[in-house]
């Protein structure tokens, strides 16, 4: 087998779960992939990211599903998995439901910024087919990194924002905040 070989199509059973906004990563993936087809990868590492090889309609895919805030371990796990899928031309389905990267100095010192940059570069450099499904919150730079896909789909009720709410307020209402004597009341 090589990269010119036609991919195998497997027998499959339709999923029985229903995708809902803000579902846990594994449950969100289970609603989209063929029943009992998932083989989870790196299960003990980066708990807020679910990575698995699975089938959708009998076709092999790599699934990355996010939840909550992403620490440096979660980001490294997703990046490593997408690079693996890209190396073997396995299409990647990314289910985005995250409030962003963990905003902590300790996470930054542990490599959070480096891993976030690596994740963005991995998605940008990947030549395999990439589909992003926004299934909850997609806020800030993590949206830009994870939704760098060939196709983006949003579930009804999801939230997409290029800026975190606090950053958006400070940008959009800067004049009002500067003019106010009581910033908390503004």
Features from the language model and the residues they span:
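Ligand-binding clefts of soluble mixed alpha/beta catalytic domains
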Residues: 1-186
